[in-house]
Amino acid sequence: ALFIGTAPLSALASSSQNTDPYIASFKAYSDEIKALDTSTSKAASNTFQTYADEVFSVEQKAGYIGDELPIPKAVKVMEGVYTVVGSFIWGTPANFGLNNNLSAIIFEDGVFIYNGGPNEAVAYSFHQQIKRITNKPVKWLAVENDQGHAYFGSSYWYDVGVKNLYSEKRANDNFHQIFEETKDRYAKGRGTTITQSVYDVTDKFTTFSDTKTIDVGGGETVQLINFGGGHTPSMTGMYIPSRNLLFSGDLGFNERVPGLLNDSFFKEWISSFEKMASMVPSDVTVIPGHGTPTDMATLKRQTYDYFVELYQEVQKVVDSGGGLAEIDAIDQSKHKDRPVFSQLSISNARHIYNELMAQKSL
């Protein structure tokens, strides 16, 4: 995207669906001159067309042209590992759509990014922080699932030369299918200007179904693992054995109440969490999808135990023949101080109830 100062002027023309008004004006003027059908007008038309093409090339190689946004400062989790902890609420214009975590891991051969960011401006701003930490190039990017705040910034990373992009296959296929719909929703909820420059680079991703191991130099590897669905139908978790470091994706929430979406299934979430916990050491350091870095015991309490306990209470209502009134009355006050509790407590309970009732009717 092209920004001057803090006022956005235009969006990067990275695809036919995202036309920079500045570039488009030269293309339109070129067409108007060409329509005059004289040798002079044709020469002038070619000049303007060439200029527009050159501007487009410069903007695309830059990925983003504009100010660095005041996103949260990356925190050092351990040596060579940094995470920007996103807002604990929804993505909004005020937080630039950044309500999940963005991480950078520095290896001998370069930097590995986990999550592309909700837009190119946030991705660029995170990149500037990385450049102040290390002069090593960003070489790899993995995204946690098929949500916009994981994927949309990927077009920035691709434009600046990151060619090793990774995602679980089902998530990548799904994001391609819902790209325009999701982009429109993000534009309405987080701002048109900050969203409009993103474009679909799912065809540039290397996909996997279960696991994929990546050699990142210095004898270290990164393991990409689809631990299973739950919050979303599938996901890309990441484990680095040499650092004993786990990226749980949205299977793990810390502080913030985890949320059940339209395509979420709580039983699958519980099962996937169990699988994840069984595949890593108990003393692993965890960077969750939402919330601050933590340990597995805390993550289990904040996510897994939350769902198991709520499930048990909802099951009691189902067994006694109760309905939504009883579901809404379930006491969840122990979680009342967690961010977005008021927005998610009842909807989560209702989601579990509806899921149980649907299974009961089979």
Regions found by a protein language model. Give the residues of each.
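Accessory terminal helices/loops
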Residues: 17-66, 278-283, 292-362
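Short Gly/Thr-rich strand-loop-strand
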Residues: 70-84, 202
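Short acidic-hydrophobic surface loop/beta-edge motif
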Residues: 74-77, 105, 210-217
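Divalent metal-coordination and catalytic microenvironments
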Residues: 80, 105, 115, 130, ...
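Metallo-beta-lactamase
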Residues: 110-112, 118-120, 213, 221, ...
